[in-house]
Amino acid sequence: MSVTDYNARLYEKMKAEQDKYRDWLLHQEPSEILNHTYEYIVGHNDGNVYPNGLISRAETATVFFRLLKDEVRDGNLLTSNTYSDVPDDYWANTAISTMTGLGIVQGHSGTAFDPEAPITRAQFAAICARFDTGAGGTTQTFSDISGHWAEEYIRRVAGLGWIKGFEDGTFRPDAYITRAQAMTMINRVLNRIPEENSDLPAGMNTWPDCNPCLLY
């Protein structure tokens, strides 16, 4: 299936299910849908993406930096910051500096970002909430987030259907998020919700360590 055919098929599906794709601009033509499709992850040099591994705070800032519209990124681009642990020559400096300037990511303090540390589920949910500030969904909560600093962020993105908790009713906000969980959450933010393999475009990037039979 060509990208054009895929866009046309997705466009018709989105019109038929507008409640699910409520954040998309459904007045657009199929050819324009591609403008809202971003390649935001890159595998490792060995060709794997390590879905069950952790994602660092620097990697997270870079992913959301790539998701910015070009005009937003270009108009707010920063190459310096106040973090002592993110020097100008750090590989993710521009992403961290820009996303901090936009208020989407935050450091542990004004002078420390801890870029190589893995990111927690609460921190990731908060970034998703700051990245898309549109209308909220239904109220939803979990048994272990009352009084947590990210409670309102978590409740909002859960109500929008972007994040899921665990079967025991917990969210485990301070647990680290896996790469697969993070990408699943981002895809929900972007309304990339393929229901079957035929919904996926031909020629899409794949990784040998991602089992197509698994939920992610």
At which residue positions do the language-model features occur?
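Feature responds to low-complexity, polar/acidic, surface-exposed segments characteristic
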Residues: 16, 23-93, 102-122, 129-153, ...
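BZIP DNA-binding basic region
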Residues: 2-13
